[in-house]
Structures are given as C-alpha cells and as structure tokens.
Amino acid sequence: MKLSVIIVNYNVKYYLEQCLNSLEQATEDVSHEIIVVDNASTDGSTEYITTRFPDVRWIASKKNNGFSKGNNIAFAQAKGEYLLMLNPDTIVTKEAIEGCITFMDSHNDTGACGVYMLRTDGSFAPESRRALPTPFVAFCKMSGLSTLFPKSRTFGRYYMQYLDKEKENPIEIISGAYMMIRHKALKETGPLDEDFFMYGEDIDLSYRILKKGYKNYFLPLRILHYKGESTNKSTYRYVHTFYRAMQLFFKKHYSHYSFLISLPINVAIWGRAILAYVGNQFRHRKIQEKPAKNCIVIGSAESIAQVSDILCEKHKNGKHTFIEANEAIMPQGHLSDSISLEEYDTVVYDTNAYTYGTILKLLNTAPGRRMNLATYSTESQKLITGDNVYDYCDISKEK
C-alpha cells in the first residue's frame, strides 16, 4: 500500500465530511487507506461519518486523548509506505497528494513533506513552512520581531518568508495540518511525543526527523486549511496553549542552555500571553455583529435554490448573485470576464459542479482583492465557510 491517511477528529463532522470528499477525488489513482481516530466527539461524528464513508477505518476513543495520542493510535495500525497526517478542516487536491508521493519516491533522503496551505481567502498561510525554533528564533517569534521584519533572514526566520513560495525548498518544520511522512523515517524517530497535547508536536517530530539525517521539504502544491480563519490566535487560551507547548519543546531540546538564555524566552512567552488576555477582555466588551456576506454563488440550479434560501435567512441584507454553471461550461468560475468582483466578498462553489482542485486553483489566482471561499453540496446540504456551517435542512424546516 502506498499511502495511509490519518485524521484525528473532534466535533467537526461537517468539515471532516468535506475533507473526506476531497480525499476521494485526490486519491482515486493511489493505493491507500484512510484511518480516522475520533477523540470522543459529542456532535454525532461517529454515526454521521461511518454511514456515509463505510470504507474509512473509524477508531472511536472513549475520551479526548489529544492530537498526538490520537495520531499515534492510527500510526500503530497504518500500512502505507507513506503516512499523511491530515487535519479534518482541510481540502486536499490530487495535485498535492500525487505530487508529494512523486517527490518522495524520487528523493529517498526526504523524511517528510509539507505543502502550500491556503487560507479561505486564497492567500498563503505562513505556517506552511517554518524554521526550527532555536532560542533566538523562538525569541524573535514570541517577542513580535518576526512580525515586524517578516522577510529578514535574521529576525523573520520562523516563517521563512524570504524563500520563494512557488519553489520547492528544504525547510525544517512542517505543519501537522498536512505532513506526509516516510513510514521508514517514523519507525526510526518514534511516534509523536504525547506530552504535547495540542500544538508543538509537529515541531518536535520534524526536528527528530532531521536529527535522523533526513531532509524535510516544502512543495508548492495547494491545499486549503480553515484553521487560519477559524482560530483566533490572539486569544489568551490559544496563546497560553501554544506557548506552553513551545516551553515544553525548549525544555526537551535545549535544556543545556543556561537560565540567562532561557529567561528572555519565558519573558516573551508570558508577555504575549498577558497581552492576549488583556486584549481579549476589551474585545468582549465591544462585541459587534459580523456584516452580511455579499456572495457570488456558482453551481447547479438545485444548489443555487438551496443556497439562496440559506442566504436569505442568514445574510438577508447582503447582495447576492447566482450563476448556473459548472466546470465544463464556465472553467474560469468567478474569474470569468463577465463577472465583476468589486461588490462581493465571498464566492460559493457547488462542489458537485467544480472539482476541489479547480476551486482552489481559482481561489488562489484571484486578481486584486481576495474573495473568501464557501462551498455547498446538494448531497450534504451544508454551506461551509471559514467560520460557520449552515444546514439547509434547518432552514427548510423553518420555512
């Protein structure tokens, strides 16, 4: 078997459903298996997914064991030459799956590969490639220097934005949202460190792969990852959890550094955590309703009718345009010359009318200002955006 896809799920059944649908398209020519470990979800994930995807191997945990242990449970059963650690809130493409396999087949020194992750507005997610968080690199990241000087090879090394994102490059740290690992390399390094409950485990594994003499690569192959939109990285909870993981990594791999060197790191960690906490208090005092979306909807007549009902209910003050089309009739989608994007902020694609690969390609090549992506399927009857899932069945019952 060539590939084992491993997904850890926790209460995101609709995003997972879409991820699995994209995998069906992406792996049709690859011998593979898909293993989903459910961390005791309470949203009915088990019943919902297993009835729709009977070929997926479903492992239901009795409690939330965290991301690392969830993946390790699947690693122990995986049979593929390559292992793809994949987040459920992603859309993958045939280009990404087959491109990574082809690259690793021809580069035997590659331990793991990462890809070009898109945000829902089509922009590049900087966490697609990262450098090892050495004491200095970590300090620059946590103090904000890397944000002030993103292109600097000295201060902005964490996200490596000085590298050409359209070219394959050796990097150090690969995101656990999409990490294709050589099974042989994982056997040599050992599985994920379960002390990392959430965040940091991908950094630790990437580093251990490098220490075994392998190389890690970034490949300019597109996938979409919703996390960049749906996770507020300025909240106290996120900052505390993430930087606590950084502390664990620092203690594990740089314990030989003196207290005087580690002190600035800890100051930066807690400084960012305090700022996030204070900022969060101000945000809670001034909660504003999100403005209505202005949508271009492209798809079949059936999908247009259903999405129209959802938008009339949820974004009734927005301006919406509906275009009956598919990939064969209108391959340029929302980028067609006949469509003006000036008044719109969101494009909704019918995933039965356009392949996921085409949707991401169009999203990534949008000229001028960015358009946020939403998807709809008449099979699931769910409108999925970066921050919400709208159920047509709920809307139709209210009518």
Please name every model-derived segment.
Residues 1-24, 288-290, 340-341, 387, ...:
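N-proximal low-complexity "stem/linker" segments adjacent to membrane-targeting elements
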Residues 21-31, 314-315:
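Short, acidic, metal-binding catalytic loop of nucleotide-sugar glycosyltransferases
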Residues 60-78, 99:
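Glycine-rich, basic loop-to-helix element that forms the pyrophosphate-binding segment
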Residues 207-282:
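Active-site-adjacent helix/loop segment of glycosyltransferases
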Residues 132-171:
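Short, flexible, basic/aromatic active-site loop/helix in glycosyltransferases
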Residues 22, 38-46, 63:
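A conserved acidic beta->alpha catalytic loop
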Residues 91-127:
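Conserved donor NDP-sugar-binding/catalytic core segment of glycosyltransferases
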Residues 83:
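Short aromatic/hydrophobic "clamp" motif used to bind/position activated sugar donors
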